[in-house]
From Swiss-Prot:
It is found in: Cell membrane. It is a multi-pass membrane protein. GO terms for cellular component: plasma membrane. Residues 32-36, 92-103, 150-370 are cytoplasmic. The gene is desK. The chain crosses the membrane at residues 11-31, 37-57, 71-91, 104-124, 129-149. PANTHER family: NITRATE/NITRITE SENSOR PROTEIN NARX-RELATED, SENSOR HISTIDINE KINASE DESK. It comes from Bacillus subtilis (strain 168). This is Sensor histidine kinase DesK. Its EC number is 2.7.13.3. Residues 186-369 form the Histidine kinase domain. It catalyses: ATP + protein L-histidine = ADP + protein N-phospho-L-histidine. The keyword Transferase applies. One of its GO terms (molecular function) is phosphoprotein phosphatase activity. Keywords: ATP-binding, Cell membrane, Kinase, Membrane, Nucleotide-binding, Phosphoprotein, Transferase, Transmembrane, Transmembrane helix, Two-component regulatory system.
Amino acid sequence: MIKNHFTFQKLNGITPYIWTIFFILPFYFIWKSSSTFVIIVGIILTLLFFSVYRFAFVSKGWTIYLWGFLLIGISTASITLFSYIYFAFFIAYFIGNIKERVPFHILYYVHLISAAVAANFSLVLKKEFFLTQIPFVVITLISAILLPFSIKSRKERERLEEKLEDANERIAELVKLEERQRIARDLHDTLGQKLSLIGLKSDLARKLIYKDPEQAARELKSVQQTARTSLNEVRKIVSSMKGIRLKDELINIKQILEAADIMFIYEEEKWPENISLLNENILSMCLKEAVTNVVKHSQAKTCRVDIQQLWKEVVITVSDDGTFKGEENSFSKGHGLLGMRERLEFANGSLHIDTENGTKLTMAIPNNSK
C-alpha cells in the first residue's frame, strides 16, 4: 500500500510558499561567479530546486526519495560551485514534515553527510567567499541538525491532539448514547406498567359510565392519581440527568455572540439559589435557543441577558436591538420558540415575546417545580 508521508496543504498552509520568496538570495551568490557558463548552470539549478521543492511537498510513496535525493544533490552542487549552503534550511524543513520514520531518517542523515562533506570540501579549498561566511555556515549546519526533529515533534504533537480531540468527541457520543439508553430503560420500567394500568382503567371506566357511574368515577379518579404519579416520576428521572448549568451556558452564548460580532451585555446580580436541576436545565436550553435566534434571525448588534431571582420564580430576559419583519403571532410559532414554550410549560413556566424595539423574550419558571 502506498502511504502519504505528509499532506502539504493541510499541515503547512502557505509557509512553504513564503519560504519560496527567498529564492532571490541564491542569485546573489551566482552573480559572484566569473564564468558565464557557471552562472547559467546556477540559475538552472536554483529554478530546478524550487520546482522540485514544490513537488516534494505533495509527493507520496517512493517518490519522496526521488525528490529528496534530487534536492540534496542540488544543494550539494550549490555549496561546491557557489558556496551557497542555505538550501539546507529548506531541505531541513522538508525532512521535518515527513511522517514516516524510515524515509525521515534516511534523508536526514544523507542530507547532513552531504552538506558536511561539501562544506568541508569548500573549507579545504579555502574558497575566499566561503570563508567569509563561516559563522553563518555553522548556524546553518546546526539548524540542519536540529530543525527536522523540532518540526517533526511539533507535527506529531498536532496529530496526537487531533486524534485526542476525535477520541473525546467519540467518547462524548458514546456517553450520550448510554445516557439515552439508560433514560429509555428508566422510562420503560417506570412508566410502562402505569401507562398500561391507565389504559385498562380508562377502558373499564368507559364501559361502566352508564352501568355504574359511581364505579366509573372511582376508576377515573384512580387514572388521574396514576397520571400524576407518573408525571412526578418523569420529572425525577429528568432531574437525575446530567443537566446544563446556567453559568456554563452563559459562557457558551458569550462565545457564540462574540463569534457573530454581536456585543454581549450581562450584569451579574444575585444568582438564583432555590432552583431545581430540572428547571435550571430547561432554562439553559431555552437560553441557548433564544441566543441562537438572535444570531441567525435578528441582525442585531447587541444582545442583553438578565437573570433575576424573584420570590416565586426565576426570570430570564433576552433582548436585542435587531429587526423582525412579520407579525408577533407568526414569530412565536417559529424559530424554535414553540419548543421553548413547551419545555417551560412542562415545568409550569411561561414564555412572553415582545417584538417592539427589537425582540425581547421573557422566560419564567418556578423556583421549584411541583
